[in-house]
Design a protein with these regions (language model features):
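Active-site beta->alpha loop and helix N-cap motifs at the rims of alpha/beta catalytic domains
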Residues: 43, 48-161
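N-terminal small/glycine-rich loop or linker at the start of catalytic domains
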Residues: 1-21, 75-78, 85, 109, ...
């Protein structure tokens, strides 16, 4: 039975692409999409939405709207892509016209949610990217990577700042290297929730076989 207070985002293809350069066989993709549709997953993150690269990468590192339109997407889930925040900041600096080069307005896209992944220490640099995506009609999520080991004050001050922007719909924290234990998850959730009132999510890794219990703790 689905808990209506919890939304499940599946990022198997986006995260799994590190093993095959995001070059997935179409038959596998079709089977995967059918499976997640039957599993009551709420959101499917299809891949990255990256800037052009000089080396070969499969289509799911770009996950363009034209490419997505060729897929047989079930109607039930929402669909998402992820941006590597550092990539956009390093390559474009303050020029956010790059966002408009790779995103259409939401009304012309099958993507509903864009997640921006960025190191905890560089979160303040993500505001302009998120604001432009919001203006284009997308739901926008912040995925804080390398979020482990900060002080309660750091978490609270970060939550205050991003709440004040009004550009993020969801806040995620990632167990980037898989070393969080439940007490770490509890600390982060409690600290962020003091100043963040919108949905809060966790991206757990299973290095210590704690992904499930960490998710339940969150």
């Amino acid at each position: 039975m689905k808990n209506n207070n919890i939304n499940i985002l599946d990022c198997t293809m986006r995260d799994g692409g590190y093993y095959n350069k995001w070059d997935f066989n179409r038959t596998i993709v079709d089977r995967y999409l059918s499976s997640v549709n039957n599993s009551m997953v709420d959101i499917v993150e299809l891949g990255f939405r990256s800037l052009p690269k000089n080396t070969f990468m499969g289509p799911y590192v770009y996950t363009t709207d034209d490419f997505i339109n060729q897929l047989d997407l079930p109607e039930s889930p929402l669909y998402a892509v992820m941006l590597n925040g550092k990539e956009f900041i390093d390559k474009l600096g303050g020029d956010q016209s790059g966002i408009k080069r790779i995103f259409q307005k939401k009304e012309n896209s099958l993507i509903s949610l864009v997640r921006i992944a960025i190191n905890f220490n560089h979160i303040l640099e993500s505001e302009s990217i998120a604001r432009q995506l919001q203006d284009m009609g997308y739901m926008v999520a912040l995925s804080m990577i390398q979020a482990h080991g900060k002080s309660e004050k750091d978490y609270i001050e970060t939550a205050i700042k991003i709440s004040s922007w009004g550009v993020y719909d969801v806040l995620y924290f990632a167990d980037s290297i898989g070393n969080m234990v439940p007490k770490d998850v509890e600390k982060i959730c409690k600290a962020l929730s003091k100043e963040w009132e919108l949905p809060l999510g966790i991206h757990a890794h299973n290095n210590k076989n704690l992904a499930l219990i960490n998710s339940i703790t969150a």
